[in-house]
Amino acid sequence: MILPTIAIIGRPNVGKSTLVNRLCQSNDAIVFDKPGVTRDRTYQNASWGGKEFQIVDTGGLVFDDESEFLPEIRTQVFLALEEASLALLVVDGNQGVTDGDLSIAKWLRNSSCKTIVAVNKCESTTLGISLASEFWKLGLGEPNPVSAIHGSGTGDLLDLVIGELPENNIQDDEEKIMMSIIGRPNVGKSSLLNSICGEKRAIVSDISGTTTDSIDTLIKKGDNNWKIIDTAGIRRKKNVKYGTEFFGINRAFKSIDRSDVCVLVIDAVDGVTDQDQKLAGRIEEQGRACIIVVNKWDLIEKNSSTIYQVEKELRSKLYFLHWSKMIFISALTGQRVDNIFEHALNAVNQHRRRVTTSVVNEVLKESISWKSPPTKRSGKQGRLYYGTQVKNKPPTFTLFVNDPKLFGITYRRYIEKQIRVNLGFEGTPLILLWRGKQQRALNKEVERENIELIQKD
């Protein structure tokens, strides 16, 4: 479904993100009492009166000021208006009409986009009508008093909004693959997003922390629809102060949790840091498919063996993700960027894959023939009766054995490796659940499922 888009526009700190959260009935937009919290444009879906649409939140718009990030924020606002079906100009009722409001209103009047004025911070209905009346001078029609914090007036505002929107262009509601771009600050995540999209979708700067929110971007590659999430850079907890970065990092962790596949971006120049290792552990812990993207490869002096040496060194430190594909790219030049989708799609497919019990047991039987389960000093030997896949996302296998304690970590890793070697599963973690059960307790189950035991007591 292609949804009509509403662009939320206004000066810094007039309550745009709070209003977005109110209209979308969510807390996805970061709200903090400080100008410049929202920089890139961020999207959320909403519905009202049986009509669905998406709202794009933008940074505070300031003309004639070239201070840090303001030119880039302007570019993001301009792009948001280009794709919008409707603009919602948010102003501060308590402050009244400012020169900034007049400049934005003039720009909107010269655009071809229909605009509705929302006068925010009108907590009292009676007083709100009085405060809103001043904004007739913007020349954009009737101003509408609302309170983003308390919700008053937002229902009437939404009634106006859906009345101005075009009918939804309904297409096949195709599944979207959720891909999050994860990494430390300044490893090139936003540059990678821009390279993938072929436009300046996110603000890029050498200053750490430019991205403070998680940015969702829809893109179609081949037959697949992707939702790409660019996340805030994640630093050590002790270096993170309460505020926008704190909220952004929480959003980034949530992005991992809701992803089908994570793209962990590593800086080729800096190599793997402690924080990279923690992020790798988080991805593995959440059971997400993953590919490792080594960015800034264009900055490395190379010979014929460099890539192999670097990969070996990186993998030795990213042992949590030993199963992930590693590719070397340059977001700046676009080198190998398109390969990301191929490997990410393969990782997603492997993450969702199911294997029949008969195939699983063929692999286990062959694995045992090459290397028998260990025998304890007491003379008791491990017996592996059979295995079956019990779920996917990530692929999870239950292995029924006589006593899990007889199977040490070395042999468990061997079995996992054999499953990967014989069945694939590149790009996804595997979970092996070792369950102790007496053979006689399994007899009815294996007879019912027509399973042949690999080993018997």
Swiss-Prot record:
Q: Which keywords annotate this record?
A: GTP-binding, Nucleotide-binding, Repeat, Ribosome biogenesis
Task: Please list the disulfide bridges.
Answer: none
Q: Which residues bind GTP 2?
A: 183-190, 230-234, 295-298
* Residue sites binding GTP 1 per the record: 10-17, 57-61, 120-123
Checking InterPro entries in the record gives: G_ENGA, GTP-bd, GTPase_Der, KH_dom-like, KH_dom-like_a/b, P-loop_NTPase, Small_GTP-bd
Which PANTHER family does the UniProt record give? Answer: GTPASE DER
| Designated name of the protein | GTPase Der
Protein species of origin? Prochlorococcus marinus (strain AS9601)
